[in-house]
């Protein structure tokens, strides 16, 4: 499928094994796999309706490896929004996001208009937690981005993550419906301007 100029591109970054692919697959296909299969790069698409025209939500699931810096730079330069994933069971995985965030700042420049979500995945493994949510919230405030904890395994906050990311988009109106119900915030937004929902 050729890339369209009106694609809305979301890039997902994070260390290997934090659950990037699991989050994307849970959102796009509603599935979860127990086994870990390293990703080089996969792209998933969802059709969304945006201001009465059709566009595509394109989600790029990037590699957790540091062996492909050129691919990482390309994903950042083409991306409209970013999801930075760490595992709550691994402090190291949170540390590894810092250079990625710095690279996004360097490539994108004006961070005010860039939607970014900091995501603590695997919140179902709380007994093994190494990163407290308060610590991640503080980092998100420093980065001026949103924060959420998720569990791809339990399907906790997965759709909500993508909804919140799209709510952060200031340059155009994009949103998705969760179980056919629209939030009060979404209804308010739609009254103010055009609307975008996942089909």
Curated annotation (Swiss-Prot):
Protein name as catalogued: GTP-binding protein Di-Ras2
Species for this entry: Macaca fascicularis
Propeptide: 197-199
Keyword Iron-sulfur: no
UniProt-listed Enzyme Commission number(s): 3.6.5.-
Keywords associated with the record: Cell membrane, GTP-binding, Hydrolase, Lipoprotein, Membrane, Methylation, Nucleotide-binding, Phosphoprotein, Prenylation, Ubl conjugation
Purpose: Displays low GTPase activity and exists predominantly in the GTP-bound form.
Catalysed reaction, written as an equation: GTP + H2O = GDP + phosphate + H(+)
UniProt family annotation: Belongs to the small GTPase superfamily. Di-Ras family.
Residues bearing PTM Phosphoserine: 35, 126
